[in-house]
C-alpha cells in the first residue's frame, strides 16, 4: 500500500510466552535461507521457493551456499548448525527446551543484523538497462513523449507495464495512474521498488513460467 508491503498474516501474532520460538525454523526457511542464497550464490535461487512453498529446506541451503558462510556467525548458526540439528534430531523425541526472553531477543537481534548485512552484488541483464541502452538522448526523450501522449489518451486508472526493467516508464505512467510494474529480473525489480513510488507495485514475473 502506497509503495510499502502490508503484513496480512495477522493470525501469526500471539501473546508472548516463555519458551522456544515456534516459528524459528519457518522464518529461517522462508526468509533467511532465500536471502542468503541470493546474496552469497545467485540471485535466481529465489525461484526455489516456487517448488518449496513451505520454505527452502535448510539442508539444501547449507549445501548450496559457499563454504565461506561458515565464517559468518549468523549464517553458521541459523543455517549450517540449524540444518545439522534438524538432521540429528529428526527421528528423536526432544524435550521442550527452556528459553528466556533475553535469549529469544538475542536470537531475533542476530537474525536482524545477519539479514541487514546480506547484499546482492550480482549484475543482471536488465538491471542497468537504461544506462547501457543504445538509445540516443533524443530518441529516449521522443519515446517518453510518445508514451506520455498515449497514456493521456487512454486515461486508465490502472496501467500494467510488462518488461518494466527498473521502472523508468512505470514512473511516467504513475503520474496519472496506478501501475503494476512487472519484470523477470529481480535486481531490476528491486531497483524499481527502492524508488518507493506509492503508485507503483513492482513484481518479479516470468510470463513464460508463471507461478
Identify the meaning behind each predicted range.
Residues 1-39:
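Catalytic activation segment of kinase domains across protein kinase-like and atypical kinase folds
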Residues 26-119:
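N-terminal auxiliary segments of SAM/dcSAM-dependent transferases
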Residues 116-139:
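Class I SAM-dependent transferase core
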Residues 138-157:
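Conserved alpha-helix/loop element of class I SAM-dependent methyltransferases that forms part
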Residues 155-165:
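Conserved class I S-adenosyl-L-methionine
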Residues 166-176:
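Conserved SAM-binding loop of SAM-dependent methyltransferases across substrates and taxa
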Residues 178-183:
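Conserved SAM-binding motif I beta-strand of class I
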Residues 191-211:
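S-adenosyl-L-methionine
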